[in-house]
Amino acid sequence: MIYSLLLSALPLLSSAALTYRGADISSLLIEEDAGISYKNLNGETQALEDILVNNGVNSIRQRVWVDPSDGSYDLDYNLKLAKRVQAAGMSIYLDLHLSDTWADPSDQTTPTGWSTTDIDTLTWQLYNYTLDVCNTFAENDIDIEIVSIGNEISSGLLWPLGKTSNYDNIAKLLHSGAWGVKDSNQATTPKIMIHLDNGWDWEEQEYFYKTVLATGSLLSTDFDLMGVSYYPFYSSEATLSALQTSLTNMQSNYDKSVVVVETNWPVSCPDPEYSFPSDLSSIPFSAAGQEEFLEKLAEVVEGVTDGLGIYYWEPAWVDNAALGSSCADNLMVDIDTDEVLESVTVFEDL
């Protein structure tokens, strides 16, 4: 009797708890064009998307730029990538930067040809853009799971009209962008996300949402998910404990599901610019450390009501191993051999 009970419990114990066990592989096509061929844990050349899905990844995040000068990350680029992702059996999460280049808290440049002087014109342009992106994916028989209206928009989006000096404009833009997604021809309406940086900082999250929702121009029903970036190497205050508090408060105050949409852990960090958070200081800078970090992070996300998932940011961008940080290497791929590290298997257990 006891033996049979244990057997019946095994599937529950081994099943993954997170809805989204994800990775952002936006630079895959660029890396392949540069001659990089990824190898699985057996040292065999294999498509990166197949390596990832075989190790438990079930969702891929892709950044989308509007009109980049060289075509990198534009709509056509993302269609090519998404077709491969969908064929591999993973869901697709589009991270709309709403710019021709990088958008983050330090820079939210409005795309070329979009209005920088009239908010009504800009909201209409944004609506038509999100509508067109989703419809183009639908025309290509590609389903979208999540759409983020902007990337790390704690300082606003589509500057100058969408700066935090005018939260009503921010609210109007988010409302308009969301409805472009809702009005699209996607077979199932994608989940709509708002994404902020510093997910561990509850005060930052609270101020943004409280202020933008107070305008009345953005409705709680306009979006489904709250996404956050969580990088442990930019502040000693970015503890797992602080993240847990922040995510818990976000969910309970706004009744939205929460997702950590960007995170990393280094395999090499000889000279970090900032001290690492105290509750992460024992984790080594190694592939084993990546596994330990993601397991601990998953425990935090799973412990939050409606905590849905984690996306590892650019684990295979071999030509940019530091990933913008002061750590030398945050990848899950060996930069000398292009073979994935053992840490990639952690997704099976998240």
From Swiss-Prot:
Cited function: Endogalactanase involved in the degradation of plant cell wall polysaccharides, and more particularly of hairy regions of pectin.
Classification lineage: Eukaryota, Fungi, Dikarya, Ascomycota, Pezizomycotina
Glycosylation sites: 128
EC assignment: 3.2.1.89
A Pfam cross-reference name: Glyco_hydro_53
Signal peptide: 1-16
Protein name (Swiss-Prot/TrEMBL): Probable arabinogalactan endo-beta-1,4-galactanase A
GO terms of biological process kind: cell wall organization; pectin catabolic process
Residue ranges of coiled coil: none
Keywords recorded for this protein, A-Z: Carbohydrate metabolism, Cell wall biogenesis/degradation, Glycoprotein, Glycosidase, Hydrolase, Polysaccharide degradation, Secreted, Signal
Annotated active site: 152 (proton donor), 262 (nucleophile)
Catalytic activity: The enzyme specifically hydrolyzes (1->4)-beta-D-galactosidic linkages in type I arabinogalactans
Family affiliation: Belongs to the glycosyl hydrolase 53 family.
UniProt KW Cell wall biogenesis/degradation keyword: yes
Organism of this sequence: Aspergillus niger (strain ATCC MYA-4892 / CBS 513.88 / FGSC A1513)
Localization per record: Secreted
Principal subcellular localisation of the protein: secreted
Matching PANTHER family: ARABINOGALACTAN ENDO-BETA-1,4-GALACTANASE A
GO MF, one annotated term: glucosidase activity
